[in-house]
A protein has these predicted regions:
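Alpha-helical interaction/dimerization surfaces of two-component signaling modules
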Residues: 40-44, 140, 157, 161
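Conserved active-site alpha-helix within GNAT-family acetyltransferase domains
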Residues: 131-132, 150-178
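Acetyl-CoA-dependent GNAT
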Residues: 6, 12-13, 24, 28-34, ...
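Conserved GNAT acetyl-CoA-binding A-motif
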Residues: 139-150
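Terminal substrate-recognition subdomain of acyl/acetyltransferases
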Residues: 2-19, 179-193
C-alpha cells in the first residue's frame, strides 16, 4: 500500500476555475480512497500548522509513518460506521477534500456526533464545495468539532453552518506540541429534516 504524502497541489488550468459548475463531486469514500484522503489531510495539516505547530512536531505528524497510521485508524473507523466523504476534482479525478464524522467516544461530548476531520486542498477552497461536503457528511445532525484556536477561516466556516464557539476554555493538544484548540458546537438541529 502506498502511504506517501505527495499530493500535487499545482494550480489548475485557467479555463477551468475552481468555481466552475460541476467541477467537483462529493461521494462516499471507500477503503481504497483512504490513502489519498489521508495524504490530503497531511498536506492541509502541514499548511495550517506552519507557525503554530513546532517544526519538528509538524514534520513528524505529517510524515509517511503518521499517514500510514491514519489510514489504519480510518479503516477501523469506517468499519465501525464512521461517515467518510471525499470531494473529487473531475478534471483529474483527484481527491481534494476529505471529511469524516463519527459517533463520539468522548465522555464529555456535547453532541453524539463529532466531525473528526474536514480538510481541503488550497486549490479547492472558496468555491462552495466545502459547504456541500459538510452537508453530505453530517446533514442536519447536531455535531461538534475541534479546530486550532487561531484558525479564523475554520471558525468562520463552521459558524456559517450554525456552529457556535463553545464557552469552555478549549483544550491543548500536546501531541501537536501544545497547540490550543477551540471546540465549536451545532446543537438543536431537527434530525429529520
Amino acid at each position: 500500500m502506498d502511504t506517501s504524502v505527495n499530493v500535487d497541489t499545482s494550480s489548475r488550468p485557467a479555463h477551468e476555475p475552481a468555481t466552475a459548475p460541476g467541477r467537483f463531486v462529493v461521494r462516499d469514500a471507500c477503503h481504497e480512497d483512504l490513502p489519498e484522503a489521508a495524504a490530503v489531510q497531511a498536506v492541509c495539516v502541514r499548511e495550517i500548522g506552519q507557525g503554530v505547530i513546532p517544526n519538528d512536531v509538524l514534520t513528524e505528524v505529517t510524515g509517511p509513518g503518521i499517514v500510514h497510521t491514519t489510514i489504519e485508524q480510518w479503516n477501523h473507523f469506517m468499519d465501525d460506521g464512521a461517515i467518510f466523504k471525499i470531494l473529487v476534482d473531475r478534471l483529474d479525478m483527484r481527491t481534494v477534500r476529505v471529511a469524516m464524522a463519527r459517533v463520539s467516544t468522548s465522555s464529555d461530548a456535547p453532541t453524539p456526533w463529532e466531525i473528526a476531520t474536514l480538510h481541503v486542498l488550497p486549490e479547492a477552497r472558496n468555491c462552495g464545495a466545502s459547504d456541500n461536503l459538510l452537508d453530505a457528511c453530517i446533514g442536519n445532525r447536531s455535531a461538534y468539532v475541534w479546530v486550532f484556536a487561531d484558525n479564523a477561516r475554520a471558525i468562520s466556516f463552521y459558524q456559517r453552518h450554525g456552529f457556535h464557539v463553545d464557552a469552555s476554555d478549549g483544550a491543548v493538544d500536546d501531541s501537536l506540541g501544545g497547540v490550543e484548540l477551540q471546540r465549536l458546537i451545532r446543537e438543536d438541529i431537527i434530525e429529520s429534516q
